[in-house]
Amino acid sequence: MKAKDIAELLDEPACSHNKKEKSGCAKPKPGATDGRCSFDGAQIALLPVADVAHIVHGPIACAGSSWDNRGTRSSGPDLYRIGMTTDLTENDVIMGRAEKRLFHAIRQAVESYLPPAVFVYNTCVPALIGDDVDAVCKAAAERFGTPVIPVDSAGFYGTKNLGNRIAGEAMLKYVIGTREPDPLPVGSERPGIRVHDVNLIGEYNIAGEFWHVLPLLDELGLRVLCTLAGDARYREVQTMHRAEVNMMVCSKAMLNVARKLQETYGTPWFEGSFYGITDTSQALRDFARLLDDPDLTARTEALIAREEAKVRAALEPWRARLEGKRVLLYTGGVKSWSVVSPLQDLGMKVVATGTKKSTEEDKARIRELMGDDVKMLDEGNARVLLKTVDEYQADILIAGGRNMYTALKGRVPFLDINQEREFGYGGYDRMLELVRHVCITLECPVWEAVRRPAPWDIPASQDARPSGGPFGER
């Protein structure tokens, strides 16, 4: 990818902080090889497209280090679960065999699995030696009759967020707009309900949580053409240009997709979240507002009233156990503010939140929810996290899996909230799942046990000693 193309991706007019100085390649830090590069960002953004063959063109470590980093789930095809790579070695680089290996890898994927498309992810090594991945993909598509989409996402281009944008740009350039949506199935129309087509951009169906939101949209007559990219299919991505409204779910990483769909097709968009009662209700209201359908607005308010009453009644027995508990939330991106709302719905107080991967808009949402004097953690090493826990008397640390051992060493209750988790927390009914896990974590008897002084640390008392002989006989 040329430098001017990277600069264009970094230039995002829809961001209010767009005029600030931008840095394409972040300064390397210890531990940075665990991901967070452009390749990692591009792959986790598109890997949830379940029926596509995903080929990583590069050394095998690139495929191995990033595969399955995001716990997305599919309701059908599982081809995305198969890790494919060209496994470049030193000999391939020296002898100039990298492009040939890629061509044969595409052929093997097409002949073995018959996918509707193949996504090829460029990495650092082939980018440095000058492989023409675009030309190879074009030749393979003509030869095998299957779309082959190049995703030029070499890790040294920049950060994980840039990789998300590169992935979105590839979809805009090669996929979106290449097919029209299917007509509504015969007999699926409901009298008096007009069906509206919508997209969800940046929804990854972590632990299947989107499946708990989809019934709400179906009830309102909102047909989801595509979720980019959780539980998505290639043919669905092709039809995204025909949506009436786009919802930006995962912060601003794929904002370029929403903006360009608006510029090209006039599709309005908004940013929202399905975490917590308040944010879920607001997202449904925003759909109704932008679609400008009075009947939809009335039905939306009725659904919100019903669901809120039901979930608040179910939460009432738990509230007394959680109200007033103090939370240190250390995560990034959209979760730095979207998880605050459900915790506040439970009467809990978020004393600090992590903003390492948060945009300026994310930070503005945090201040709106928690006040201007909120504690934001840009860096969260073990020392900083434990110091913050002590300083703010936090009862629980809610963070990603990599912080689990920090919490355990500090004897602090810990709940994993990041993309690797096994439980979904999106939608109204999954609030109960979040509450259950928070309660289980806080009330686990192990915390009382590990905080209790060991017997050998308790000063011996003369009165506590048995009288008499060595065995206490009188």
UniProtKB/Swiss-Prot annotation:
Pathway assigned in UniProt: Cofactor biosynthesis; Fe-Mo cofactor biosynthesis
A Pfam family annotated for this UniProt entry: Oxidored_nitro
Top-level taxon of the source organism: Bacteria
Cysteine-cysteine disulfides: none
GO molecular function, one term: nitrogenase activity
GO biological process: molybdopterin cofactor biosynthetic process; nitrogen fixation; protein-containing complex assembly
Family, similarity comment: Belongs to the NifD/NifK/NifE/NifN family.
Function: This protein may play a role in the biosynthesis of the prosthetic group of nitrogenase (FeMo cofactor).
Protein name: Nitrogenase iron-molybdenum cofactor biosynthesis protein NifE
Organism: Azotobacter vinelandii
